[in-house]
Amino acid sequence: MSGRVPWLDGARGIAIILVVLFHAGMFTVPTGLASPWWEPLNLVFALLRMPLFFLVAGMLAVGAVQRSWPALWRTRLAVLVWVFLVWTVLRFAYYQVVPEPIDLNQSSWTDFVLSVVRPSNGLWFLFALALFLVAAKALHGRVNRWVALAIATVASSVAHGGFTFGNVTYDGIMKYFVFFMLGLYLREPIIRFVHRRRWPATVALLVVFAAAIVLRGATGWFVDAATAVPVGLIAVAFGLCLSRNLARTPFTRLLSRPLEYLGRRTLQVYVTHILLLSTFTSVLMPFADTAVLTMLRPVMPVLMTATVIPVSLLIAAGCERVPVLRLLYAAPTWSSRERAGAALP
């Protein structure tokens, strides 16, 4: 199936909501604004949110990696590199002025200088995605796809088994490259698989995913390593089937359309939401023990997520009206053929 597949945008919408929810918990639990059980709950979705994001990115990159290097730069890489650099500077400048509500080490000059080769903040996804596109282009037509997938699977298993570089970016590259390549190489079989799965199969995938998470939690590192990719694929299959069924079922289309809208604007949310979460957390922290906020602790990450996503979109829409601010989310015309940047590639 060629052309745009709307439910893939819906899947990206699901993924970005889970990413924001994870970061909302990351800010609100340590500061006493949210219930502690949000930390293990967010860990449950670890094998869904980023694998889903990267697999869909791979599915949408099939045409891009077949283009020439200059075309790949203009249509995909330029916006990733530009936005990564711009927001790295913005985040560093922000945390030079505003204290961090939690210790993310975002104001370190050493980390800032090294960020072009060793990012250590939430923008690592952009760095990794650009690297994945370069790697996929370099491998295209030169390395057998099954060999590439086998190597990427082993790397992911090793990383999920406990191996670490001590850096979120390098660890993420090891863990998630396999999902990007699976999306890239198996786009059509994945689409056919999803199109044949209705609601009963979607629910069954959720049950299998939940059972697998419980079993993994009761085992050691070897089982964690060996099952990471298979369980991640079950989770991704659930996310894709959920998005597809929401889109094709009449009474759930009201949910799928906002998800698809959001999925086409993931870049704006991804780069903006952390600063908003940080700001809102800092504002609320002095009142963490008040009666109202104590009552809201069980749902605070959800409330934060429901707030920062639309605010991120509003900020981006406002910036779109001002030429110089438009460059916060799009590469300058001299570096890119497209003024792309609405959605992560």
Positions of the model-derived regions?
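Aromatic-anchored segments of alpha-helical transmembrane domains
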Residues: 17-24, 87-89, 151-164, 205-218, ...
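Alpha-helical membrane-inserting segments
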Residues: 86, 90-94, 98, 135, ...
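Membrane-cytosol interface segments of multi-pass membrane proteins
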Residues: 1-154, 176, 288-345
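Specific transmembrane alpha-helix
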Residues: 50-63, 125-137, 163-194, 228-250, ...
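Alpha-helical transmembrane segments and terminal signal-anchor/GPI-anchor hydrophobic tails
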Residues: 194-260, 275, 280-284, 291, ...
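Membrane-interface helix-boundary motifs at transmembrane edges
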Residues: 2-5, 65-75, 135-146, 187-199, ...
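Membrane-interface helix-boundary signature
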Residues: 1-11, 39-42, 74, 167, ...
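Interfacial loop-to-helix transition and helix-capping segments at the boundaries
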Residues: 38-50, 113-127, 161-179, 213-238, ...
